[in-house]
Amino acid sequence: RQQPFVPRL
């Protein structure tokens, strides 16, 4: 499944 693009700061 595709994961949402969430850049971790």
Swiss-Prot record:
Its main location: secreted. Keywords: Amidation, Neuropeptide, Secreted. Transmembrane segments: none annotated. One of its GO terms (biological process) is neuropeptide signaling pathway. InterPro entries: Pyrokinin_CS. The keyword Transcription does not apply. It is found in: Secreted. It comes from the Eukaryota. One of its GO terms (molecular function) is neuropeptide hormone activity. GO terms for cellular component: extracellular region. The modification Leucine amide is found at residue 9. Potent mediator of visceral muscle contractile activity (myotropic activity). This is Locustamyotropin-3. It comes from Locusta migratoria (Migratory locust).
